[in-house]
Amino acid sequence: MRASEVMIADPIVVAAGATSSEVAALMRTKNISVVPVVDNPKDRRYLGTISDRDIVTRCVGLGHDPGDCAVQDHARTDTPVVKPETELKGYKLPKQLDPGDHHVRATIVVIDGDKRVLGFIPHPEEVPGIIIAP
């Protein structure tokens, strides 16, 4: 099974420069918890990924005002990325944990050769053949 077969095509993205408050409001409105961060909505070049939990732990939890936090400053840059043609059977996805955290952060962003976001796989642990590596 290829990434293009299971990804959410043309996912919601947020542009660098958006505030954590704006992203949190978008997440609430769209009922999503993770979103790719891109350079701008037109080009959609991937910069990182931000989750609702990241906003809490990397912005609010550190005493910052989410209205003043630029989302790219708190985005994760270690989210796995693949091409649409990537075969997922046997794909090893690293378990991403913060120190002292037991919450698995498993997501995959699908990009093209120019790093443009094409898709998003929000729950790869549910995709047959993907291995969550310890």
Question: Model-derived features: where do they sit?
Answer:
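The conserved cystathionine-beta-synthase
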Residues: V13-I32, V38-D39, V81-R105, V110-D112, ...
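Methionine-biased hydrophobic packing positions in alpha-helices, especially
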Residues: M1, M7, M27, A75, ...
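Bateman (tandem CBS) regulatory domains
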Residues: M1-I12, D54, D68-T79
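Short beta-to-alpha loop/turn elements within the nucleotide-binding domains of ABC transporters
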Residues: M1, A18, I50, C69, ...
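Short beta->alpha transition motifs characteristic of CBS
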Residues: I32, P36, R45-G61, H102-D112, ...
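Regulatory sensory and allosteric helical modules in signal-transduction proteins
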Residues: T57-G61, T77-P84
